[in-house]
Amino acid sequence: MKQAAWMGWLTIALACAAPMAHADDAQPWSKAKAEAWYAKQAWPVGSNYVPSDAINELEMWQAASFDPARIDQELGWAQGMGINTMRVFLHNLLWEQDKDGFKKRIDTFLSIAAKHHIKPIFVLFDSCWDPDPVLGPQHPPIPGVHNSGWVQAPGTKVLDDPSHYPQLEDYVKDIVGSFAHDERILAWDVWNEPDNDGGGNYAAEEPKDKFQRVAQLLPQVFAWARSQSPVQPLTSGVWHDADWSNLSKLNAVERTQLTESDIISFHNYDFPEIFASRVQQLRGYGRPMICTEYMARSAGSTIDTITPLGKKLDVGMINWGFVSGKTQTIFPWDSWQRPYTLQPPVIWFHDLLQPDGTPYRQREADILRALSRAPKGVVPDAATLFPTAMAVH
Protein backbone atom coordinates (compact mmCIF):
# COMPACT_ATOMS: atom_id res chain seq x y z
CA MET A 1 0.00 0.00 0.00
CA LYS A 2 2.79 2.40 0.92
CA GLN A 3 4.63 1.44 -2.26
CA ALA A 4 1.49 2.03 -4.32
CA ALA A 5 0.97 5.40 -2.68
CA TRP A 6 4.60 6.33 -3.26
CA MET A 7 4.34 5.30 -6.91
CA GLY A 8 1.18 7.36 -7.22
CA TRP A 9 2.89 10.45 -5.86
CA LEU A 10 5.88 9.81 -8.14
CA THR A 11 3.59 9.61 -11.16
CA ILE A 12 1.93 12.90 -10.19
CA ALA A 13 5.31 14.54 -9.59
CA LEU A 14 6.64 13.44 -12.96
CA ALA A 15 3.48 14.58 -14.69
CA CYS A 16 3.83 17.98 -13.09
CA ALA A 17 7.54 18.22 -13.82
CA ALA A 18 7.25 17.37 -17.52
CA PRO A 19 5.29 20.48 -18.53
CA MET A 20 7.67 22.63 -16.48
CA ALA A 21 10.69 21.17 -18.27
CA HIS A 22 8.98 21.72 -21.60
CA ALA A 23 8.16 25.31 -20.64
CA ASP A 24 11.80 25.92 -19.70
CA ASP A 25 12.93 24.55 -23.07
CA ALA A 26 10.58 26.97 -24.81
CA GLN A 27 12.28 29.99 -23.23
CA PRO A 28 15.69 31.54 -23.89
CA TRP A 29 18.42 30.45 -21.54
CA SER A 30 18.65 32.31 -18.27
CA LYS A 31 21.49 34.81 -18.08
CA ALA A 32 23.17 32.58 -15.50
CA LYS A 33 23.01 29.57 -17.82
CA ALA A 34 24.42 31.63 -20.70
CA GLU A 35 27.29 32.89 -18.54
CA ALA A 36 28.01 29.37 -17.28
CA TRP A 37 28.14 28.10 -20.86
CA TYR A 38 30.51 30.89 -21.91
CA ALA A 39 32.78 30.28 -18.92
CA LYS A 40 33.43 26.76 -20.22
CA GLN A 41 34.45 27.93 -23.69
CA ALA A 42 37.77 29.17 -24.95
CA TRP A 43 37.62 32.79 -26.09
CA PRO A 44 35.89 32.39 -29.49
CA VAL A 45 38.04 33.62 -32.37
CA GLY A 46 37.66 32.72 -36.02
CA SER A 47 36.30 33.59 -39.44
CA ASN A 48 33.19 33.24 -41.53
CA TYR A 49 34.16 30.20 -43.56
CA VAL A 50 33.43 28.87 -47.00
CA PRO A 51 36.08 26.82 -48.84
CA SER A 52 38.03 28.85 -51.38
CA ASP A 53 36.67 26.70 -54.23
CA ALA A 54 33.02 27.42 -53.37
CA ILE A 55 31.15 30.55 -54.47
CA ASN A 56 28.39 30.05 -51.89
CA GLU A 57 26.91 27.70 -49.32
CA LEU A 58 25.26 25.52 -51.98
CA GLU A 59 28.55 24.83 -53.73
CA MET A 60 30.21 24.15 -50.39
CA TRP A 61 27.73 21.47 -49.32
CA GLN A 62 26.29 19.76 -52.43
CA ALA A 63 27.55 16.21 -52.87
CA ALA A 64 29.13 16.89 -56.27
CA SER A 65 31.26 19.79 -55.00
CA PHE A 66 31.77 19.01 -51.29
CA ASP A 67 35.56 18.94 -50.84
CA PRO A 68 36.70 17.39 -47.53
CA ALA A 69 40.38 17.45 -48.54
CA ARG A 70 40.34 21.20 -49.14
CA ILE A 71 38.36 21.82 -45.96
CA ASP A 72 40.90 19.76 -44.01
CA GLN A 73 43.78 21.73 -45.49
CA GLU A 74 42.19 25.12 -44.89
CA LEU A 75 41.06 24.34 -41.34
CA GLY A 76 44.60 23.13 -40.70
CA TRP A 77 45.83 26.59 -41.68
CA ALA A 78 43.24 28.06 -39.32
CA GLN A 79 44.42 25.87 -36.45
CA GLY A 80 47.96 27.11 -37.01
CA MET A 81 46.72 30.68 -36.54
CA GLY A 82 45.01 29.90 -33.24
CA ILE A 83 41.49 29.93 -34.68
CA ASN A 84 39.01 27.87 -32.65
CA THR A 85 35.67 28.58 -34.32
CA MET A 86 34.25 29.16 -37.80
CA ARG A 87 30.87 30.56 -38.74
CA VAL A 88 29.45 28.33 -41.47
CA PHE A 89 26.26 28.78 -43.51
CA LEU A 90 23.80 25.96 -44.22
CA HIS A 91 20.77 26.10 -46.56
CA ASN A 92 17.24 24.72 -46.51
CA LEU A 93 17.47 23.63 -50.17
CA LEU A 94 20.38 21.34 -49.34
CA TRP A 95 18.21 19.58 -46.79
CA GLU A 96 15.25 19.36 -49.18
CA GLN A 97 17.49 17.92 -51.89
CA ASP A 98 19.19 15.22 -49.81
CA LYS A 99 18.39 15.15 -46.09
CA ASP A 100 20.51 12.18 -45.11
CA GLY A 101 23.41 13.05 -47.38
CA PHE A 102 23.47 16.64 -46.18
CA LYS A 103 23.56 15.56 -42.54
CA LYS A 104 26.36 13.09 -43.30
CA ARG A 105 28.38 15.88 -44.91
CA ILE A 106 27.75 18.10 -41.87
CA ASP A 107 29.03 15.26 -39.70
CA THR A 108 32.11 14.92 -41.93
CA PHE A 109 32.75 18.65 -41.65
CA LEU A 110 32.39 18.47 -37.87
CA SER A 111 34.88 15.61 -37.70
CA ILE A 112 37.41 17.58 -39.73
CA ALA A 113 36.82 20.70 -37.64
CA ALA A 114 37.18 18.75 -34.38
CA LYS A 115 40.48 17.32 -35.63
CA HIS A 116 41.70 20.92 -35.79
CA HIS A 117 40.10 21.92 -32.46
CA ILE A 118 37.53 24.15 -34.18
CA LYS A 119 33.89 24.36 -33.02
CA PRO A 120 31.72 25.97 -35.72
CA ILE A 121 28.68 28.18 -35.43
CA PHE A 122 26.11 27.02 -37.97
CA VAL A 123 23.82 29.56 -39.69
CA LEU A 124 20.38 28.26 -40.69
CA PHE A 125 18.97 31.15 -42.77
CA ASP A 126 20.36 34.27 -44.45
CA SER A 127 18.72 37.38 -45.95
CA CYS A 128 21.74 38.61 -47.95
CA TRP A 129 22.50 38.73 -51.69
CA ASP A 130 20.78 36.64 -54.41
CA PRO A 131 17.13 35.96 -53.44
CA ASP A 132 16.70 33.20 -56.03
CA PRO A 133 18.85 30.23 -54.94
CA VAL A 134 18.99 27.31 -57.35
CA LEU A 135 20.48 23.88 -56.68
CA GLY A 136 23.00 22.30 -59.04
CA PRO A 137 26.13 23.80 -60.57
CA GLN A 138 26.60 27.42 -59.52
CA HIS A 139 27.56 30.21 -61.91
CA PRO A 140 31.20 31.37 -61.98
CA PRO A 141 32.15 34.54 -60.08
CA ILE A 142 31.36 37.85 -61.75
CA PRO A 143 34.81 39.39 -62.35
CA GLY A 144 35.78 41.99 -59.78
CA VAL A 145 32.55 41.77 -57.74
CA HIS A 146 32.21 41.06 -54.01
CA ASN A 147 30.23 37.90 -53.12
CA SER A 148 28.72 37.73 -56.59
CA GLY A 149 27.24 34.26 -56.13
CA TRP A 150 26.05 34.18 -52.53
CA VAL A 151 22.41 33.14 -52.12
CA GLN A 152 19.69 33.81 -49.56
CA ALA A 153 17.97 31.15 -47.50
CA PRO A 154 15.09 30.81 -47.86
CA GLY A 155 14.73 32.39 -51.27
CA THR A 156 11.95 34.70 -52.40
CA LYS A 157 9.77 31.89 -53.76
CA VAL A 158 9.66 30.20 -50.35
CA LEU A 159 9.49 33.36 -48.27
CA ASP A 160 6.59 34.64 -50.38
CA ASP A 161 4.51 31.49 -49.93
CA PRO A 162 3.59 30.51 -46.35
CA SER A 163 2.55 27.07 -47.57
CA HIS A 164 6.29 26.30 -47.66
CA TYR A 165 6.83 27.23 -44.02
CA PRO A 166 6.06 23.75 -42.62
CA GLN A 167 8.97 22.49 -44.72
CA LEU A 168 11.21 25.18 -43.21
CA GLU A 169 10.07 24.02 -39.79
CA ASP A 170 10.99 20.43 -40.64
CA TYR A 171 14.41 21.58 -41.87
CA VAL A 172 15.19 23.51 -38.69
CA LYS A 173 13.95 20.79 -36.37
CA ASP A 174 15.76 18.01 -38.22
CA ILE A 175 19.12 19.79 -38.50
CA VAL A 176 19.14 21.21 -34.97
CA GLY A 177 17.60 18.05 -33.54
CA SER A 178 20.13 15.78 -35.25
CA PHE A 179 23.03 17.69 -33.71
CA ALA A 180 21.37 19.09 -30.58
CA HIS A 181 23.75 17.27 -28.24
CA ASP A 182 26.86 17.45 -30.42
CA GLU A 183 29.59 19.15 -28.41
CA ARG A 184 31.56 19.75 -31.62
CA ILE A 185 29.19 22.66 -32.40
CA LEU A 186 29.62 25.99 -30.61
CA ALA A 187 26.25 27.63 -31.36
CA TRP A 188 23.34 28.03 -33.78
CA ASP A 189 22.93 31.36 -35.57
CA VAL A 190 19.32 30.97 -36.64
CA TRP A 191 19.20 33.81 -39.21
CA ASN A 192 21.92 36.04 -40.62
CA GLU A 193 20.91 39.72 -40.87
CA PRO A 194 17.21 38.80 -41.17
CA ASP A 195 16.06 42.36 -41.86
CA ASN A 196 18.67 43.01 -44.55
CA ASP A 197 17.04 44.11 -47.81
CA GLY A 198 19.42 41.86 -49.72
CA GLY A 199 22.21 44.01 -51.07
CA GLY A 200 23.81 43.84 -54.49
CA ASN A 201 21.64 44.61 -57.51
CA TYR A 202 18.71 42.39 -56.54
CA ALA A 203 16.18 44.98 -55.32
CA ALA A 204 13.66 44.22 -58.08
CA GLU A 205 13.65 40.53 -57.13
CA GLU A 206 13.00 41.04 -53.42
CA PRO A 207 9.47 40.68 -51.98
CA LYS A 208 7.92 44.06 -51.25
CA ASP A 209 6.81 42.79 -47.84
CA LYS A 210 10.05 40.96 -47.05
CA PHE A 211 10.49 42.67 -43.69
CA GLN A 212 6.97 41.80 -42.53
CA ARG A 213 7.35 38.16 -43.56
CA VAL A 214 10.72 37.82 -41.85
CA ALA A 215 9.43 39.57 -38.72
CA GLN A 216 6.65 36.97 -38.48
CA LEU A 217 8.89 34.02 -39.30
CA LEU A 218 11.93 34.75 -37.12
CA PRO A 219 10.24 34.08 -33.74
CA GLN A 220 8.99 30.79 -35.15
CA VAL A 221 12.50 29.81 -36.25
CA PHE A 222 13.80 30.44 -32.74
CA ALA A 223 10.92 28.33 -31.36
CA TRP A 224 11.53 25.48 -33.82
CA ALA A 225 15.21 25.35 -32.96
CA ARG A 226 14.59 25.66 -29.23
CA SER A 227 12.01 22.84 -29.31
CA GLN A 228 14.90 20.44 -29.96
CA SER A 229 16.51 21.36 -26.60
CA PRO A 230 20.00 21.94 -28.02
CA VAL A 231 22.94 22.08 -25.63
CA GLN A 232 24.31 24.85 -27.84
CA PRO A 233 23.02 28.43 -27.51
CA LEU A 234 20.82 30.11 -30.13
CA THR A 235 21.53 33.57 -31.48
CA SER A 236 20.88 36.00 -34.34
CA GLY A 237 23.06 39.05 -34.73
CA VAL A 238 21.89 42.66 -34.82
CA TRP A 239 23.77 44.64 -37.43
CA HIS A 240 22.30 48.12 -38.08
CA ASP A 241 20.60 51.10 -36.38
CA ALA A 242 22.44 53.62 -34.26
CA ASP A 243 21.65 52.35 -30.76
CA TRP A 244 20.83 48.81 -29.62
CA SER A 245 20.46 49.60 -25.93
CA ASN A 246 16.75 50.51 -25.98
CA LEU A 247 14.42 47.76 -27.23
CA SER A 248 11.50 50.15 -27.59
CA LYS A 249 13.37 52.05 -30.31
CA LEU A 250 14.23 48.97 -32.37
CA ASN A 251 12.21 47.25 -35.08
CA ALA A 252 10.34 43.98 -34.57
CA VAL A 253 13.12 41.84 -36.01
CA GLU A 254 15.78 43.38 -33.78
CA ARG A 255 13.60 43.00 -30.71
CA THR A 256 13.20 39.31 -31.49
CA GLN A 257 16.94 38.93 -32.03
CA LEU A 258 17.83 40.50 -28.70
CA THR A 259 15.09 38.91 -26.59
CA GLU A 260 15.21 35.38 -28.05
CA SER A 261 18.98 34.93 -28.27
CA ASP A 262 20.67 32.88 -25.56
CA ILE A 263 23.90 34.73 -26.26
CA ILE A 264 24.11 38.13 -27.95
CA SER A 265 25.74 38.41 -31.35
CA PHE A 266 26.26 41.44 -33.54
CA HIS A 267 28.05 42.69 -36.65
CA ASN A 268 30.30 45.72 -36.84
CA TYR A 269 32.58 46.93 -39.62
CA ASP A 270 33.45 50.32 -38.09
CA PHE A 271 36.34 52.09 -36.38
CA PRO A 272 37.44 50.88 -32.92
CA GLU A 273 35.65 53.63 -31.00
CA ILE A 274 32.35 52.72 -32.69
CA PHE A 275 32.92 49.03 -32.03
CA ALA A 276 33.49 49.80 -28.34
CA SER A 277 30.29 51.86 -28.19
CA ARG A 278 28.34 48.97 -29.74
CA VAL A 279 29.62 46.60 -27.07
CA GLN A 280 28.60 49.08 -24.40
CA GLN A 281 25.09 49.33 -25.87
CA LEU A 282 24.69 45.56 -25.61
CA ARG A 283 26.15 45.15 -22.10
CA GLY A 284 22.76 45.87 -20.54
CA TYR A 285 21.33 42.60 -21.85
CA GLY A 286 23.64 40.78 -19.45
CA ARG A 287 24.66 37.97 -21.78
CA PRO A 288 27.92 36.77 -23.35
CA MET A 289 28.69 38.45 -26.66
CA ILE A 290 30.21 37.35 -29.95
CA CYS A 291 30.85 39.72 -32.85
CA THR A 292 30.04 37.33 -35.69
CA GLU A 293 31.07 39.70 -38.49
CA TYR A 294 33.82 42.33 -38.58
CA MET A 295 36.97 43.31 -40.49
CA ALA A 296 36.62 45.58 -43.49
CA ARG A 297 40.13 46.97 -43.75
CA SER A 298 39.39 49.99 -45.92
CA ALA A 299 36.39 50.91 -43.72
CA GLY A 300 38.54 51.08 -40.58
CA SER A 301 37.81 47.65 -39.10
CA THR A 302 41.10 45.74 -38.89
CA ILE A 303 42.65 42.78 -37.14
CA ASP A 304 45.29 45.09 -35.63
CA THR A 305 42.80 47.39 -33.88
CA ILE A 306 39.45 45.63 -33.47
CA THR A 307 40.47 42.10 -32.52
CA PRO A 308 42.61 43.05 -29.49
CA LEU A 309 39.82 45.40 -28.39
CA GLY A 310 37.31 42.56 -28.60
CA LYS A 311 39.64 40.39 -26.54
CA LYS A 312 40.05 43.10 -23.90
CA LEU A 313 36.26 43.48 -23.69
CA ASP A 314 35.83 39.68 -23.61
CA VAL A 315 33.77 39.63 -26.80
CA GLY A 316 34.20 36.66 -29.14
CA MET A 317 35.48 37.75 -32.56
CA ILE A 318 34.67 36.22 -35.96
CA ASN A 319 35.88 38.17 -38.99
CA TRP A 320 34.41 37.92 -42.48
CA GLY A 321 36.40 35.73 -44.83
CA PHE A 322 39.22 33.25 -44.44
CA VAL A 323 40.89 32.11 -47.68
CA SER A 324 40.59 34.34 -50.74
CA GLY A 325 38.64 32.44 -53.38
CA LYS A 326 35.47 32.32 -55.45
CA THR A 327 33.49 34.57 -53.09
CA GLN A 328 35.89 37.40 -54.04
CA THR A 329 35.38 39.22 -50.77
CA ILE A 330 38.79 40.84 -51.10
CA PHE A 331 36.76 43.34 -53.16
CA PRO A 332 34.69 45.91 -51.22
CA TRP A 333 30.90 46.22 -51.25
CA ASP A 334 31.02 49.08 -53.78
CA SER A 335 32.34 46.64 -56.39
CA TRP A 336 28.68 45.95 -57.21
CA GLN A 337 28.58 49.47 -58.66
CA ARG A 338 32.25 49.66 -59.77
CA PRO A 339 33.70 46.18 -60.42
CA TYR A 340 37.43 45.87 -59.80
CA THR A 341 38.20 44.40 -63.22
CA LEU A 342 41.19 46.53 -64.24
CA GLN A 343 43.14 46.39 -61.00
CA PRO A 344 42.70 44.99 -57.48
CA PRO A 345 41.79 47.25 -54.55
CA VAL A 346 44.68 49.03 -52.85
CA ILE A 347 43.96 46.95 -49.76
CA TRP A 348 41.99 43.72 -49.38
CA PHE A 349 38.53 44.32 -47.94
CA HIS A 350 38.00 40.90 -46.27
CA ASP A 351 39.84 37.54 -46.03
CA LEU A 352 43.00 36.53 -44.19
CA LEU A 353 44.88 34.10 -46.45
CA GLN A 354 46.04 33.78 -50.04
CA PRO A 355 44.77 30.66 -51.87
CA ASP A 356 48.03 28.85 -51.03
CA GLY A 357 47.62 29.53 -47.30
CA THR A 358 50.07 32.43 -47.11
CA PRO A 359 48.74 35.20 -44.85
CA TYR A 360 47.72 38.40 -46.61
CA ARG A 361 49.62 40.07 -43.76
CA GLN A 362 51.78 37.96 -41.49
CA ARG A 363 51.19 40.48 -38.71
CA GLU A 364 47.45 39.65 -38.71
CA ALA A 365 48.17 35.94 -38.30
CA ASP A 366 50.61 36.71 -35.47
CA ILE A 367 48.02 38.85 -33.65
CA LEU A 368 45.31 36.18 -33.89
CA ARG A 369 47.70 33.50 -32.65
CA ALA A 370 48.89 35.61 -29.71
CA LEU A 371 45.36 36.56 -28.69
CA SER A 372 44.06 33.00 -28.86
CA ARG A 373 46.80 31.76 -26.53
CA ALA A 374 46.14 34.35 -23.81
CA PRO A 375 43.44 34.05 -21.11
CA LYS A 376 40.05 35.68 -21.68
CA GLY A 377 40.17 39.44 -21.37
CA VAL A 378 43.97 39.52 -21.63
CA VAL A 379 45.73 41.21 -24.56
CA PRO A 380 49.36 40.04 -24.62
CA ASP A 381 52.12 42.40 -25.63
CA ALA A 382 52.61 40.51 -28.90
CA ALA A 383 49.08 41.49 -30.01
CA THR A 384 49.34 45.22 -29.28
CA LEU A 385 49.82 47.82 -32.00
CA PHE A 386 53.43 48.39 -30.98
CA PRO A 387 54.70 45.26 -29.22
CA THR A 388 57.97 45.49 -27.35
CA ALA A 389 59.63 43.06 -29.75
CA MET A 390 58.96 45.45 -32.65
CA ALA A 391 60.16 48.57 -30.86
CA VAL A 392 62.77 50.61 -32.72
CA HIS A 393 65.85 51.32 -30.59
Predicted feature locations:
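Bacterial N-terminal signal peptides that target proteins for export
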Residues: M1-W9
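Cleavable N-terminal signal peptides
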Residues: L10-T11, A21
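Low-complexity, Gly/Pro
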Residues: A23, F122, M390-H393
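Active-site mouth of glycoside hydrolases
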Residues: D25-S261, H267, P272-I274, Y285, ...
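Extended, alpha-helix-rich binding/interface surfaces that flank or overlap catalytic cores
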Residues: F331-A391
